[in-house]
């Protein structure tokens, strides 16, 4: 397959799955298992995934530029005693608190996680994680149907940020999905669908940014006149499509729950298990 066509298809997969609770990493691995970049190393695959994830980060910063800008300005004014309003400062602190656990655990458990990703039965692990996550999403939606009439909370507090950040660590297991872990936790804490999704978006920024910087430094030796245009192409496509997907996702959540993503995960997981056990 042509490198640019491969990059285009991977960018579409990243854009559609990064902020949905379905595991973008799992989908990208599934695709690359059948359609790898011909002639390129695994390091290039890894770096390309980081570039398209960076495009996803930029889409969040672009869509929420006014919110991030005002919160950062408010934080600066609060810290320099020019403003007594602490809301912006505490918002940024919550993002840091929520991102901190997965950054620490990811660093400590890096070798173990790399071992999991190198296992020959990784597709089975992904399938199991898809099914398990799908069941959890359906349980969460059932839980909220039982709570009909109870007011859902739109504000994420410090306790919420800590708990969401802790459970986000589960997403280090391939196939679990960072979005699923954060959204499901937020829902069990009583947050409405939009607030759950948006806080998940915000948490993605420091987490994916840290991973991106680390891997860019690690794989900088493969940057050259051949690879850079492909990486830049994937970054641009991911940014443009992710911007559209986030808008459509939030519009969808105005009238629907996360249940359909739970069903999708279960069906995908079962399909992959059937393939690995009976077809491959």
Curated annotation (Swiss-Prot):
Keyword Nucleotide-binding among record annotations: no
Reaction(s) catalysed by this chain's protein: di-trans,octa-cis-undecaprenyl diphosphate + H2O = di-trans,octa-cis-undecaprenyl phosphate + phosphate + H(+)
Record keyword Cell inner membrane present: yes
Keywords from the named record: Antibiotic resistance, Cell inner membrane, Cell membrane, Cell shape, Cell wall biogenesis/degradation, Hydrolase, Membrane, Peptidoglycan synthesis, Transmembrane, Transmembrane helix
GO molecular function: undecaprenyl-diphosphatase activity
Membrane topology per record: Multi-pass membrane protein
InterPro entries per UniProt: UppP
Compartments, as annotated in UniProt: Cell inner membrane
Domain of life where this protein originates: Bacteria
Transmembrane intervals: 19-39, 44-64, 89-109, 125-145, 156-176, 197-217, 226-246, 259-279
Function: Catalyzes the dephosphorylation of undecaprenyl diphosphate (UPP). Confers resistance to bacitracin.
Family (UniProt): Belongs to the UppP family.
Name of the featured protein: Undecaprenyl-diphosphatase
Source organism (scientific name): Leptospira borgpetersenii serovar Hardjo-bovis (strain JB197)
């Amino acid at each position: 397959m042509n490198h640019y066509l491969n990059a285009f298809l991977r960018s579409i997969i990243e854009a559609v799955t990064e902020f949905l609770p379905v595991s973008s990493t799992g989908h990208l691995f599934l695709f690359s298992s059948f359609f790898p970049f011909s002639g390129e190393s695994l390091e290039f695959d890894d770096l390309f995934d980081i570039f398209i994830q960076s495009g996803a980060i930029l889409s969040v910063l672009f869509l929420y530029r006014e919110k991030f800008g005002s919160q950062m300005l408010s934080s600066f004014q609060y810290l320099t005693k020019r403003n007594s309003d602490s809301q912006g400062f505490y918002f940024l602190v919550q993002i840091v608190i929520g991102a901190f656990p997965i950054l620490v655990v990811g660093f400590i458990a890096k070798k173990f996680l790399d071992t999991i990703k190198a296992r020959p039965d990784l597709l089975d692990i992904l399938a199991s994680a898809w099914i398990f996550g799908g069941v959890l999403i359906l349980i969460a939606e059932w839980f909220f149907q039982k709570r009909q009439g109870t007011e859902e909370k739109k504000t994420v507090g410090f306790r919420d940020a800590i708990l969401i950040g802790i459970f986000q660590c589960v997403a280090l297991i391939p196939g679990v999905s960072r979005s699923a872990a954060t959204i499901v936790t937020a829902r069990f804490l009583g947050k409405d669908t939009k607030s759950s999704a948006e806080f998940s978006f915000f948490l993605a920024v420091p987490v994916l940014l840290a991973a991106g910087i680390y891997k860019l430094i690690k794989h900088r030796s493969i940057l050259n006149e051949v690879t850079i245009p492909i990486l830049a192409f994937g970054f641009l496509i991911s940014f443009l499509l992710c911007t559209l997907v986030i808008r459509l996702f939030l519009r969808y959540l105005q009238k629907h729950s996360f249940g359909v993503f739970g069903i999708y995960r279960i069906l995908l997981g079962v399909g992959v298990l059937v393939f690995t056990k009976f077809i491959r």
